[in-house]
Amino acid sequence: MIQQKKALEIFQKRVFLESIIDETISFNKKLSWNSDNKNLTLTKTAEELVEVFKLRSDVFTEIGYQDEFPDTIEGLNFDVYDKTSAVIYYKNNKEVSATIRLIFDSENRLPSEKKESFDDMRAKYNCIGEISRNIVKTRGQGLNLEFKYLMCGIYNVFINNDIDIALSGIRKEHLKLFKKLGGVEIYKELNSYGSLETPCLIISYNPNYASNFFKKVFLEE
């Protein structure tokens, strides 16, 4: 009986994975994307998405975030929000080395609303979103290239699609870096973020107010 239950759970998770892959690919194919960087793109195949889900799992395991962001299937980190997300990834030497997603608001609402409602933002803007799953395979100190490319991807989706503002949960210590991008405001201060016992912030981000620093260093204008 226990084995049957376990087999059913595995089957249900695989069905869920297939639905996530199908709907995420469909959503990403409808988005407008304009980038000269061939290594930075939206996920549009099942193989690409599985690589992204693997990278999320590997990095979250390495940095101890699995309690807050658990795998749905062991070794694969995905959830229902992927279905309405621009899932961006960067390749280095033909290997997925970084990924980020911009979730568009839907009937599922947004993941950080488990901590704080964004209804006031919905009242102000036609379409809100949330930036999450900001994953870089090799983390160093300071501004690394992968982070730069991922934020260029977020900017790209914003400028070319119908979304007005995004919220994002970050560690308080990272605010100084994000402020440099321009268009960043503190939405809410938190003593912790779920199981992550560290001071955090929910910030709002509007790339339409990109700083000169962002345009010069990130966009290379």
Placement of each model-derived feature along the sequence:
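Short amphipathic alpha-helix that is part of the acyltransferase structural core
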Residues: F27-L76, V87-Y89, V96
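Short, solvent-exposed loop/turn elements at beta->coil junctions and helix N-caps
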Residues: T72-D79, L190-Y193
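Active-site beta-strand termini and strand-to-loop segments that position acidic
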Residues: Y90-N93, Y205
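Acyl-donor binding region in acyl/amide transferases
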Residues: E113-P207
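C-terminal helix-cap and adjacent tail motif
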Residues: S204-E221
